[in-house]
Amino acid sequence: MADVEVEQLTKRFGDFVAVDALSFGVQHGEVFGLLGPNGAGKSTLIRMLTTLVPPTSGQARIGGFDVVRQANDVRQRIGVIPQAMTSDMDLSARENMSIFAKLYGIPREKRKRMIPALLKAVDLEQWADKPVKMFSGGMRRRLEIARGLVHEPKIFFLDEPTTGLDPVSRVAVWEMLVRLKRERDLTILLTTHYMDEADKLCDRIAIIDHGKLVALDSPLKLKASIPGRNILEVSFSEVPANWVDTLRQLPEVAEVKPHDNVFRIASHNGPRTTVALMEAAREAGITIASLSVQSTTLDDVFVHYTGHQLRDALQSAPAYSSSFMYDRK
C-alpha cells in the first residue's frame, strides 16, 4: 500500500478549479516532488493532503487513513513544513521545539532526550539556546524541519522548502533532507518551482499546471521522454516566412517550438544541428542574435508538456499565500 494515495482529488473555489481530478500514489521511502508555478495548485493539494482544506470531490488517504473521515489519525502520522516560517523569533531554538513537543503531548523526559538529538540532526546543536532572531534563513528552515519531526512522523510534507534561501543554504537543506530521509525512514512529499531542486532531490516528479497533472515519472525518464538529447535556443535578427519549416528540415532536429522571436530546437546531435543552423542563416541572409546549446533539462520537459516555460508561468501567476498554521484539533 502506498503511503499517499490520491484518487480524482478536486478542489474548487467558486467557479475556479484549483486542483483538477488529480490521481497518483507515493510509495514508502520515496521523495516525491510536485513541480509547477505559483498558482498551479500545489499548495492547495498539500493543504488537502494535510487535512487543512476539505476536497470538493475525490479521495486521499495518508498511511491508509482518509483525510476527511480520519483526519486526526492522519495528523498524528504526518509532519508539515509550510512555506512561511512560523518559529517564534524571540524564543530560543530549544524553546520553540519544546512548545511544539508539548502540543503533541510528548512527556517531559522524552522531550529532554529528543530535542537535543533533533537539533543535532539539523546541525543546530551549538545554537540550541540562542534566540531564533539571530538565525540566518537557512538555519531557521532547518529548525522548522526539526520541529516538524518532534512527534516522529513517517510522512513529511514540505511546501517550497527552500524558497527565499541563498544557493548555499538551499544545498545544505537538500543534503539534510536526504540524510534525514535515510536515517528516519521517511516518505517525503515536497512542492517546488525550482527545477534543480526537483532534479536533485526527487525519486519521482509530478508536473502540475493549472491544477492538472501533465506528467509523472523519475527525472531521468521525464527528460528521456521528450525529443532530442540537446536543446538549442536561438533568436534571429529577423524571421523569414516559413522559417520554422526550414528549421525543422535541419539535420538531427526532432522538434521546433517558436516562442516570440526565440526558437527552441530539440536535436539528437547538438553540434551537427548548430553547424547546419549557422549555414541556413547565412544562406537566408539573416543574423543569429543569440544561440545556446545545452543538454535536456526539466525546464525543457516543462515546456514540452505545458507549452510554456516555468519562469513565464511564475511571472503571470496570481499572487497567492501558502502560509498556514497547523491545527491538531
Language model: regions and residue ranges:
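ABC transporter nucleotide-binding domains
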Residues: 2-6, 11-215
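Preference for bulky hydrophobic residues occupying beta-strand positions
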Residues: 11, 24, 233-236, 265, ...
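Residues at or immediately flanking beta-strands
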Residues: 59, 92, 131, 231, ...
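Non-catalytic alpha-helical coupling and interface elements of nucleotide-dependent molecular machines
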Residues: 105, 227, 231, 303, ...
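ABC transporter nucleotide-binding domain
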Residues: 175-268
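C-terminal coupling/interaction segments
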Residues: 269-329
